[in-house]
Design a protein with these regions (language model features):
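Conserved acetyl-CoA-binding loop of GNAT-fold acetyltransferases
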Residues: 142-152
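Short glycine/proline-centered loop/turn elements that form peptide/ligand docking sites
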Residues: 108, 112, 134-137, 153-160
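Conserved acetyl-CoA-binding loop-helix of GNAT-fold acetyltransferases
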Residues: 104-117, 121, 142-143
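Conserved acyl-donor/pantetheine-binding loop and adjacent beta-alpha core of acyl/acetyltransferases
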Residues: 63, 68-95
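Conserved N-terminal entry element of GNAT/NAT acetyltransferase domains
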Residues: 1-15, 19, 23-24, 163-165
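Conserved GNAT acetyl-CoA-binding A-motif
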Residues: 119-132
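A short, internal acetyl-CoA/4′-phosphopantetheine-binding micro-motif in the GNAT/acyltransferase core
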Residues: 93-104, 131
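Active-site rim helix/loop that mediates acceptor-substrate recognition in acyltransferases
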Residues: 21, 26-27, 35-64
Length: 165
C-alpha cells in the first residue's frame, strides 16, 4: 500500500501549488478553460499565491509515493485586495485542490483535516472559503462544518468557526 504524507509547503512546491490553484478554479474540465499560464496571471487568481510566505500564509502539500497530489493553503487578505471567499482581515481564506486523477480517495479530507488542526493550533477563530454551488467539494466542506455565509451568482462563501477539539 502506498502511503500518503502531508508536509508544509515550501518555496520549491509553489509551481505545484499554482497548478492546484488552476485545478481549483477550473475544476469542471470542460475544455474551455484558459491556458494555465494566462489564467494564473489574472490578478484575481494570482493573489492566492503571489509573494508566498507573507505573515499569515500557511500551506500543506499531500504526496503519494513521493509525488505531489494535492495542496491546501490559507492566506489572510486586506480589505482592499481580497479573494473570492473573503470575510474580513482576521479570517484566513482557504484554498484546496487535489490532482484530478487522485480525487475520490480521501486526500482532500486528509488535507482539510490537517489544515484545520494547524489553524486551531495557531489560534485562528474561523476560516472561510469560496466554492461554486455545483462543485462536488461543497459536500466535503459541509461535512467538516462549513456553513454558507454569503452568496454571489453561482458561488457561496462558506465559513467555519474553529473551536478547540
Amino acid at each position: 500500500m502506498t502511503s500518503l504524507t502531508i508536509l508544509p509547503i515550501t518555496v520549491d512546491d509553489l509551481p505545484f501549488v499554482r497548478a492546484m490553484l488552476y485545478e481549483a478554479a477550473f475544476w469542471r474540465a470542460t475544455g474551455d478553460a484558459p491556458p494555465i499560464a494566462a489564467a494564473l496571471c489574472a490578478p484575481e487568481l494570482a493573489i492566492y499565491v503571489d509573494q508566498w510566505g507573507r505573515s499569515g500564509d500557511a500551506g500543506l502539500l499531500a504526496r503519494v509515493a513521493g509525488r505531489p497530489v494535492g495542496a491546501v493553503w490559507v492566506r489572510r487578505f486586506p480589505d482592499h485586495a481580497h479573494g473570492y471567499g473573503y470575510v474580513d482581515e482576521l479570517t484566513p481564506e482557504l484554498s484546496i485542490a487535489v490532482a484530478p486523477e487522485r480525487r475520490g480517495y480521501g486526500i482532500g479530507g486528509c488535507l482539510l483535516s490537517a489544515m484545520l488542526a494547524l489553524l486551531r493550533i495557531d489560534g485562528a477563530r474561523r476560516v472561510s472559503l469560496s466554492v461554486e454551488t455545483d462543485n462536488p467539494a461543497r459536500s466535503l466542506y459541509e461535512r467538516f462544518g462549513f456553513t454558507p455565509a454569503a452568496a454571489t451568482e453561482g458561488a457561496i462563501t462558506m465559513l467555519l468557526t474553529l473551536t478547540p477539539d
